[in-house]
C-alpha cells in the first residue's frame, strides 16, 4: 500500500473528520450496553482555551474507547449562553462600534443583536471543537437558550415555586456594580488584600466618654443602626443597653449584646450595618434593628447619606475619614490584611446590598444529592473530591437565582397590575388567574446561567418530553469537568437530576486540574503565558496536541505544560508514521497464515506477550480514567518495545525468504493492527490513516468503529518474555559501555562471556539475535575475564565482557572518565546540599524538590557505574 514519505498532519485532519461525519460515525449504533456523556457546554463568549482543549480531548478518549468496545455511544455537544459574560461582551462591542449603551436599545432590540452575535460565535465554538477531532454527535447539538431547554427551565422553576422551594425575599446579596447584577455566593472570589483598619470614637449619650470601634469600611457607618459587644466580654458588660451617638450623622445607636461579636477583632466593639453586611443583617434580624441602605446599585452613596450623597463609595470613604479627623473622632488607623470579595467575571469589588431577589431553598434538594455520593452511587475521580463535595453540601446555603440582565431565561413570573397577584406559569400568562385582568407585567430579571446548566444532563435529552433518548441515555455515564466548578455546576446537576428524574445524572465524575505553564504559574493575559490550542494544532497537528494533553493529565495534580512537549509528541507521530512505512514496505509476498507456537521465535513470543499485557493494562486504565498512564504505556510499548526492539530484531528475517519471513510478517501486522486500535482514542487521525493501509481482513470499514483489541491469554509466553528481557538487558549493557567509551553503536566489536552457573544457555540459544541487535563481530565463551575489559552484563549465571584495548586509547579514556567522575562528584555534593537545606525542601516547588531527588539518585548511579568502569580498565 502506498504511504507518503512524510507525516503531514493537516492533510489527514481535513480528510478524516469529513469522512467520519459523512459516514455518521459519531451517531450511536445499537450495541452491547451504552455509554452516554454530555459535553460541559463552552461559553459562547470567545475562543476555546487550553483547559477546554484538555477537557474535550479526555472526553473524546473515553467516547472513542467505549465506541470501539461495542457500546451504543453518544456524546452530546452544546454551548452555554453565558448570561453575564455574553451581555458584558456585547455591551462592550456596541459601545465601541456604535457608541451606544444597552439602555439606548429596547430589550427586544438588544436581544436580537445578542442572538445574532451568539449564533456567529456558536459557529466559532463548533469549528474549534472539530479542530480537536471531537467525535460528538452534531445532530444532537443543544444550546442553553434553545426553545426546548427554555421549556425545561420554566417547568423546573414553576415546580419548585409550587413546592415552596423557590421564594422571593429581601436579603443581603452580592452585588456587582460593574456587571449591574446580583451574584451567587460561589460566584464571588475572595482574595487577601492589604487595607486599613480605622479606629473611630463613638460618643456615649449624656457623658464625656466614648467607645472606640474598628472598621475596614468607614463609609458604611452612615447606615449604622447599633453597636454590638459579645455578652461574655467583661470589658463592656456595663455598656450593654447604653446609647452611643453616630459620629457625623448624630443618630442614636443602642449598644446590644450578641454572641457573633469576635472579642479579638479591633476593640471588641463592632458597628452594625444591617443593610450592608450579611453578618450584620443576621444580627439585625435577631435584635429587630432598622435597615438603612446608604449605597446604591452604582456603588454610590444614596440620598440617605446626607452631604455624601452621589459620591463613589471609595471617595466617600476618604471624605468621611477626613471629617472624622477634623472632629477629633479618628483615634488611629492601622495596616490590615483582610479578605475582599470580587466578581468572578470582571474582578470588581462586590457590594453587599439589601435587595428583593429570587432564591432556591437548597437544604431539601441537597439531602438526596448527599446520599448518592456518600453511598458511592456517584464516584469521584480523584476520590478526594468526594470529601470536598460533601463538606460543601453539608453547609449549603440558599441560592440567589435572579440576575439583573436581559440576556438569559427570563423569570416566568407575571405580576398583576390590578390585584397584585403573582402569576407563575410555564406558558406566557395573558390574563391574571385570580382577577382575570390582562394588565400584567413580567418580572424583569433573568435566571442565573447555572440554573439552566444544572438541567443539562436531562434537558439535552429532551426533558420534559419523555423522549427515546431520555429513556435510553439517562443517566449519563461520565462527566468530565474542571474541579473549579464542582459547586457551580456538578453539585447542582446532581440535585436537579435527583429531584426531577428521580435518579443521579451520571455515574462517574472526573475532575481535572488547571493547566498551568511549565513553571506552575496560572495562564493569564498579563503574563503572556497562555497557550492557544488552535495555534499549537496549526503548528504540530491535532494528534500530537491530543497525546501531549493526555500524557500530562495525571489525576489530582495541576498540569504543567511546556510547549516543548508538543514537539516531543510530534516526534512520536513521526515515529509511528515511519514504522508504518517500514512495515508496509516489507509486506511483499505477504499471505495471511495461522501462527503456530512452534513457528514463533523468541522475539515473536515476547512482542505478542507484551502486546497482550499492554492491551490489558491500557483497558484497565481507561476504565478508571487514568488517561496519562494509558498514554505513557502506549508510548512506551510502541516506541521502545515494538519499534526499538521487535522491529530491529526482525529486520534480518524480513529480508529472508520462505516461511520465517511469512511468520514475522503476520506477527508484525497483528501487532501493528492492535497498536493502531489502542492508539485511536488518543491519536485518531494518524491511526485511521495508517490502519486503512494495512493489508489485513478488517472488521469495519473505518477504524473509528472497529473493535477494541481483546486480551488473548493464548498469546502470553512467560518464559519467552523472561528470556528476551535478559537478551534486552545484555544488549543494553553492551550499548551502554559503547556509549560511555565513545565507541559508535554501529561499530562491530568482539564480546566474551563467562558461564558462572551451568543452568542457563540463553546466550548460546540467542547468539545470532544478540550479535544482530548489539552490532557484534562475535560473542564467544571464555574461562577468564579478558584484561582491560568492561563488564557489560552480570546475572546469577553469566558475565559478559567487552575487551576494550582494540577499540580505545586506554590512557585517554582513563583521563576522560576521571574528569567525568569529578564533575559528577560536584553535582552530587550540590544536590545533597540542597536537599539538606530545610528551607529548600519545605518552601520550594514540590516538583523542583522531587526533580532534585531524582537527579541525585541518577548522578549517584552514574558515578558508581563510571567508577567501576575506570577500575576495570586501569
UniProtKB/Swiss-Prot annotation:
Motif range ('HIGH' region): 42-52
Compartment list: Cytoplasm
Motif ('KMSKS' region): 522-526
Residues that bind ATP: 525
Keywords: Aminoacyl-tRNA synthetase, ATP-binding, Coiled coil, Cytoplasm, Ligase, Nucleotide-binding, Protein biosynthesis
Uppermost EC category: ligase
Gene Ontology CC annotation, any one: cytosol
Coiled coil regions, renumbered to chain: 806-874
InterPro entries named among the record's database cross-references: aa-tRNA-synth_I_CS, aa-tRNA-synth_Ia, Anticodon_Ia_Val, M/V/L/I-tRNA-synth_anticd-bd, Rossmann-like_a/b/a_fold, tRNA-bd_arm, tRNAsynth_Ia_anticodon-bd, Val-tRNA_synth_C_sf
Catalytic activity field: tRNA(Val) + L-valine + ATP = L-valyl-tRNA(Val) + AMP + diphosphate
Domain of life: Bacteria
GO molecular function term, any single one: aminoacyl-tRNA deacylase activity
Subunit: Monomer.
Free-text comment about domains: ValRS has two distinct active sites: one for aminoacylation and one for editing. The misactivated threonine is translocated from the active site to the editing site.
Function recorded in the entry: Catalyzes the attachment of valine to tRNA(Val). As ValRS can inadvertently accommodate and process structurally similar amino acids such as threonine, to avoid such errors, it has a 'posttransfer' editing activity that hydrolyzes mischarged Thr-tRNA(Val) in a tRNA-dependent manner.
PANTHER family reported in the protein's UniProt record: VALINE--TRNA LIGASE, CHLOROPLASTIC_MITOCHONDRIAL 2, VALYL-TRNA SYNTHETASES
HAMAP family for the chain: Val_tRNA_synth_type1
Family: Belongs to the class-I aminoacyl-tRNA synthetase family. ValS type 1 subfamily.
UniProt-recorded name of the protein: Valine--tRNA ligase
Amino acid at each position: 500500500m502506498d504511504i507518503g514519505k512524510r507525516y503531514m498532519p493537516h492533510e489527514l485532519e481535513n480528510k478524516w473528520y469529513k469522512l467520519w461525519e459523512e459516514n455518521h460515525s459519531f451517531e450511536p449504533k445499537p450495541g452491547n450496553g451504552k455509554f452516554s456523556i454530555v459535553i460541559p457546554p463552552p461559553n459562547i463568549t470567545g475562543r476555546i482555551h487550553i483547559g477546554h482543549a484538555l477537557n474535550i480531548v479526555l472526553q473524546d478518549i473515553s467516547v472513542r474507547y467505549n465506541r470501539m468496545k461495542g457500546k451504543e455511544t453518544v456524546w452530546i455537544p452544546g454551548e452555554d449562553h453565558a448570561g453575564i459574560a455574553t451581555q458584558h461582551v456585547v455591551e462592550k462591542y456596541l459601545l465601541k462600534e456604535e457608541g451606544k449603551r444597552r439602555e439606548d436599545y429596547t430589550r427586544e432590540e438588544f436581544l436580537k443583536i445578542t442572538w445574532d452575535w451568539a449564533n456567529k460565535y456558536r459557529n466559532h465554538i463548533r469549528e474549534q471543537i472539530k479542530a480537536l477531532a471531537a467525535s460528538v454527535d452534531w445532530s444532537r447539538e443543544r444550546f442553553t437558550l434553545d426553545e426546548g431547554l427554555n421549556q425545561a427551565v420554566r417547568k423546573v422553576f414553576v415546580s419548585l415555586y409550587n413546592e415552596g422551594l423557590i421564594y422571593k425575599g429581601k436579603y443581603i446579596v452580592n452585588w456587582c456594580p460593574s456587571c449591574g447584577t446580583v451574584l451567587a455566593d460561589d460566584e464571588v472570589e475572595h482574595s487577601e488584600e492589604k487595607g486599613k483598619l480605622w479606629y473611630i470614637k463613638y460618643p456615649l449619650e449624656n457623658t464625656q466618654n466614648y467607645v472606640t470601634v474598628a472598621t475596614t469600611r468607614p463609609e458604611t457607618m452612615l447606615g449604622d443602626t447599633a453597636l454590638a459587644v459579645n455578652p461574655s466580654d467583661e470589658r463592656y458588660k456595663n455598656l450593654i443597653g447604653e446609647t452611643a451617638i453616630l459620629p457625623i450623622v448624630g443618630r442614636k445607636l443602642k449598644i446590644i449584646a450578641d454572641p457573633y461579636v469576635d472579642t479579638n477583632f479591633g476593640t471588641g466593639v463592632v458597628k452594625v450595618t444591617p443593610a450592608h453586611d450579611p453578618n450584620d443583617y443576621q444580627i439585625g434580624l435577631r435584635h429587630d434593628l432598622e435597615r438603612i441602605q446608604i449605597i446604591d446599585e452604582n456603588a454610590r452613596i444614596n440620598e440617605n447619606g446626607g452631604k455624601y450623597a452621589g459620591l463613589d463609595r471609595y471617595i466617600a470613604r476618604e471624605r468621611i475619614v477626613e471629617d472624622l479627623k477634623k472632629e477629633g473622632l479618628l483615634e488611629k488607623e492601622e495596616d490590615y490584611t483582610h479578605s475582599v470579595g470580587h466578581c468572578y467575571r470582571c474582578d470588581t469589588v462586590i457590594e453587599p446590598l439589601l435587595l428583593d431577589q429570587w432564591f432556591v431553598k437548597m437544604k431539601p434538594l441537597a439531602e438526596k444529592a448527599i446520599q448518592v455520593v456518600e453511598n458511592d452511587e456517584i464516584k469521584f475521580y480523584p476520590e478526594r473530591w468526594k470529601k470536598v463535595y460533601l463538606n460543601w453540601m453539608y453547609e449549603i446555603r440558599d441560592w440567589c437565582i435572579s440576575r439583573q440582565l436581559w440576556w438569559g431565561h427570563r423569570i416566568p413570573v407575571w405580576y398583576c397590575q390590578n390585584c397584585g397577584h403573582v402569576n407563575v406559569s410555564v406558558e406566557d400568562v395573558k390574563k391574571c388567574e385570580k382577577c382575570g385582568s390582562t394588565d400584567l407585567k413580567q418580572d424583569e430579571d433573568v435566571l442565573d446561567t447555572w440554573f439552566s446548566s444544572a438541567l443539562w444532563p436531562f434537558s439535552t435529552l429532551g426533558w420534559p418530553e419523555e423522549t427515546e433518548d431520555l429513556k435510553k441515555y439517562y443517566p449519563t455515564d461520565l462527566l468530565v469537568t474542571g474541579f473549579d466548578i464542582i459547586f457551580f455546576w456538578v453539585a447542582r446537576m446532581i440535585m436537579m437530576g435527583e429531584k426531577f428524574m428521580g435518579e443521579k445524572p451520571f455515574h462517574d465524575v472526573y475532575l481535572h486540574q488547571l493547566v498551568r505553564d511549565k513553571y506552575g504559574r496560572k495562564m493569564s493575559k498579563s503574563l503572556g503565558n497562555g497557550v492557544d490550542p488552535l495555534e499549537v494544532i496549526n503548528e504540530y497537528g491535532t494528534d500530537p496536541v491530543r497525546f501531549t494533553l493526555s500524557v500530562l493529565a495525571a489525576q489530582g495534580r495541576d498540569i504543567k505544560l511546556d510547549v516543548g512537549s508538543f514537539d516531543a509528541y510530534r516526534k512520536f507521530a513521526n515515529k509511528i508514521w515511519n514504522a508504518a512505512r517500514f512495515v508496509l514496505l516489507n509486506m511483499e509476498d505477504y499471505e495471511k497464515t495461522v501462527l503456530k507456537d512452534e513457528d514463533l521465535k523468541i522475539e515473536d513470543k515476547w512482542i505478542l506477550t507484551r502486546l497482550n499485557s499492554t492491551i490489558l493494562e491500557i483497558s484497565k486504565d481507561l476504565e478508571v480514567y487514568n488517561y496519562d498512564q494509558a498514554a505513557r504505556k502506549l508510548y512506551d510499548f510502541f516506541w521502545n518495545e515494538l519499534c526499538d526492539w521487535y522491529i530491529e530484531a526482525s529486520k534480518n528475517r524480513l529480508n529472508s525468504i520462505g516461511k520465517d519471513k511469512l511468520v514475522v510478517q503476520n506477527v508484525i501486522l497483528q501487532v501493528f493492527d492492535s497498536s493502531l486500535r489502542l492508539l485511536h482514542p488518543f491519536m485518531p487521525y494518524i491511526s485511521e490513516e495508517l490502519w486503512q493501509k494495512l493489508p489485513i481482513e478488517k472488521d469495519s470499514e473505518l477504524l473509528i468503529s472497529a473493535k477494541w483489541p481483546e486480551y488473548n491469554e493464548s498469546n502470553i509466553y512467560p518464559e519467552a518474555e523472561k528470556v528476551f528481557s535478559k537478551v534486552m538487558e545484555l544488549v543494553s549493557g553492551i550499548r551502554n559501555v559503547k556509549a560511555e567509551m565513545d565507541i559508535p553503536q554501529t561499530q562491530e566489536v568482539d564480546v566474551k562471556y563467562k558461564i558462572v552457573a551451568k543452568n542457563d544457555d540463553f546466550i548460546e540459544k540467542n547468539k545470532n539475535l544478540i550479535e544482530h541487535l548489539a552490532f557484534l563481530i562475535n560473542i564467544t565463551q571464555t574461562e577468564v575475564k579478558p584484561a582491560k575489559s568492561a563488564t557489560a552484563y552480570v546475572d546469577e549465571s553469566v558475565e559478559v565482557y567487552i575487551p576494550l584495548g582494540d577499540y580505545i586509547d586506554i590512557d585517554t579514556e582513563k583521563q576522560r572518565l576521571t574528569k567525568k567522575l569529578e564533575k559528577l562528584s560536584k553535582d552530587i555534593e550540590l544536590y545533597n546540599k540542597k536537599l539538606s537545606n530545610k528551607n529548600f525542601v519545605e518552601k520550594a516547588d514540590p516538583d523542583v524538590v522531587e526533580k532534585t531527588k531524582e537527579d541525585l539518585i541518577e548522578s549517584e548511579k552514574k558515578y558508581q557505574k563510571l567508577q567501576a568502569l575506570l577500575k576495570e580498565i586501569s
